[in-house]
């Protein structure tokens, strides 16, 4: 299945149903008073995280989602039916952005998590709501309010503990094949990896971590060179980055300059990502003598001003790979993810009263004090039905 990590969709919540103007008319009850019911609330639009999905490709074709409109009120104090909600399922790890405001509405990081992205309109009030001692035959009602309408950008970001970055052909795909069951394509030409991939590294029956492999970066990626930096977002949730350096590039390039290019592109993309823990890993040491590899790795680290520990491995022959994985596992155990407070999800509104409708009634009450209401029981009233529309 094609990997799609971005999609734009339009979500439109349902409008609220209009209130009804009606009067009770039954045999022997000629003046029964108002009995117009309220409209129904409009349906909401929700997003729900689903661990069984791993791409946003469905939303490249289906881009518009509309909830149902609330039904209008009816006579006999009948309230209109509430509009049906719409639930859109997205992969776990999806970030939701309102393109109109640039606001990040939420991150879908857990299976079953729900996020309200468009609220349905409030229902309108029937004329029963406007009756009073001075207005016994109210001919006012309110219309339902429009539902929310948003253009959303969905960004899928992989959930991994460890992220790998480096130049093309640094050996990232070979590494993930060596430590997990993932089988990304491996070849002797640049940009073999075109989409991100995940692998689960199992150290024993109880300990494991997830590693993410993204396409290689080249100089100018921040300006769109190569595959650009669009895949760097998949590393934002990683706890540690493994910076793989080809210790002896086949194209004769300078490993020090290659490493500086990667660091520079990280800083251009995000200071937060550049500040994440980053480990230096020299790959392909099997292509030279052990002593020569150690001396070259030391000189590269010194040229980069690297003061921490670094690793020498060969992903192809798995030399030094196991020790690196155990150190990563230890780091993950010692640095658990901070348990951020979960944002409270908006509860489903069961309407009883709200500021909008209270304002409508207050306005009518104020008018009643300033004007002498006509008691419209006279049969010769030819003014017809009076409507007051409020938005």
From Swiss-Prot:
It comes from Salmonella arizonae (strain ATCC BAA-731 / CDC346-86 / RSK2980). Keywords: Cytoplasm, GTP-binding, Hydrolase, Magnesium, Metal-binding, Nucleotide-binding. Residues 127-147 are annotated as: Disordered. Residues 160-333 form the OBG-type G domain. The keyword Magnesium applies. Gene3D superfamilies: GTP1/OBG domain, P-loop containing nucleotide triphosphate hydrolases. GTP binds at residues 166-173, 191-195, 213-216, 283-286, 314-316. This is GTPase Obg. Belongs to the TRAFAC class OBG-HflX-like GTPase superfamily. OBG GTPase family.
């Amino acid at each position: 299945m094609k990997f799609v990590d971005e999609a734009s969709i339009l979500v439109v919540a349902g409008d609220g149903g209009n209130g009804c103007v009606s009067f009770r008319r039954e045999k022997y009850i000629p003046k029964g008073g108002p009995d117009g019911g309220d409209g129904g609330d409009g349906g909401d639009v929700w997003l729900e995280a689903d661990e069984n999905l791993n791409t946003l490709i469905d939303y490249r074709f289906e881009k518009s989602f509309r909830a149902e409109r609330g039904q209008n009120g009816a006579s006999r104090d009948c309230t209109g039916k509430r509009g049906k909600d719409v639930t859109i399922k997205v992969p776990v790890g999806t970030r939701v952005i309102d393109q109109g405001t640039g606001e990040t509405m939420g991150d879908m990081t857990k299976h079953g998590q729900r996020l309200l992205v468009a609220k349905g309109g409030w229902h309108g009030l029937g004329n029963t709501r406007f009756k009073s001692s001075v207005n016994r035959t109210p001919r006012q009602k309110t219309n339902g309010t429009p539902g929310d309408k948003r253009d959303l950008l969905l960004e899928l970001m992989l959930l991994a503990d460890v992220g790998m970055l480096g130049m093309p052909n640094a050996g990232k795909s070979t590494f993930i094949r060596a430590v997990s069951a993932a089988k990304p394509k491996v070849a002797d030409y640049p940009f073999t990896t075109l989409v991100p991939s995940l692998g689960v590294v199992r150290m024993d029956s109880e300990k494991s971590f997830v590693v993410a492999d993204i396409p290689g970066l080249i100089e100018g990626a921040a300006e769109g060179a190569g595959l650009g930096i669009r895949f760097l977002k998949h590393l934002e949730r990683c706890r540690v980055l493994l910076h793989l350096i080809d210790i002896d590039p086949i194209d004769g390039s300078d490993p020090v300059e290659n490493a500086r290019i990667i660091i520079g592109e990280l800083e251009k993309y995000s200071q937060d990502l550049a500040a994440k823990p980053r480990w230096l890993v020299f790959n392909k040491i099997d292509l030279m003598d052990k002593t020569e590899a150690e001396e070259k790795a030391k000189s590269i680290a010194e040229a980069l001003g690297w003061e921490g520990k670094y690793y020498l491995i060969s992903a192809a022959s798995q030399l030094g790979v196991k020790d690196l994985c155990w150190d990563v596992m230890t780091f993950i155990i010692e640095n658990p993810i901070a348990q951020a407070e979960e944002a409270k999800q908006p509860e489903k509104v069961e309407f009883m009263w709200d500021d909008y409708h209270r304002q409508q009634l207050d306005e009518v009450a104020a008018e009643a004090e300033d004007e002498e209401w006509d008691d419209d029981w006279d049969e010769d009233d030819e003014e017809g039905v009076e409507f007051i529309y409020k938005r």
